[in-house]
């Protein structure tokens, strides 16, 4: 089996003090880049897709391509549902072969968030599917969901303890000052809050909104208990920027086999840097 649950890889990261990168992908080329690079560096790997990505590319297509790439590189990986909100949607994608999910009920009141997450955990654990959930809200935009900065909420440490105990989740995404998208100013992460959460919660902790974070912040967050680091926007910008630049310089270009090469190369450099920041090269 080359498509696996994220549970074991995150537990290993927690025990050994590194983080597993979760790279948001969209199509064949972006999947090729992350699997190839992770395999070359022997890094554990999670490939993530939002509901919009799965609608665009097709869940069956993503799972099939990921499985074939994982097999050809002899590199097990997790295909992960990022920021999914509906149990019925998750059930359909689990049936299609996904083994790692994030249920996002962070926009609901605390009790309703618990109830939704618990229903997903009860279903997914029957099929050895790992479940991540979010407590607190990140600002910025993820897919079609936009959260204004004033509506972002940090994770409360004591609520985190109760949330994990009542839901039975495998990992917890927390809000400590990161945001989706690129930062207009350097973020100030609440490392004290992260420490307090880690003291109360024994499951692996997840950091969303890592695109553009300084290496020192990622390294410190990992040292304080972060076990999974999500990167999306930085990958898209590298890929699309190189593609636009190539087409600007080669107006006659019409062959995707040519103009995708620099786009993939630019994205690969970001993937390599994130793996280095996570300290997970050679950890597969």
From Swiss-Prot:
Its EC number is 4.1.2.40. GO terms for molecular function: tagatose-bisphosphate aldolase activity; zinc ion binding. Signal peptide: none annotated. Its cofactor is Zn(2+). It comes from the Bacteria. It is an enzyme of class 4 (lyase). Zn(2+) binds at residues 83, 180, 208. Keywords: Galactitol metabolism, Lyase, Metal-binding, Zinc. Catalytic subunit of the tagatose-1,6-bisphosphate aldolase GatYZ, which catalyzes the reversible aldol condensation of dihydroxyacetone phosphate (DHAP or glycerone-phosphate) with glyceraldehyde 3-phosphate (G3P) to produce tagatose 1,6-bisphosphate (TBP). Requires GatZ subunit for full activity and stability. Is involved in the catabolism of galactitol. Forms a complex with GatZ. This is D-tagatose-1,6-bisphosphate aldolase subunit GatY. It comes from Salmonella newport (strain SL254).
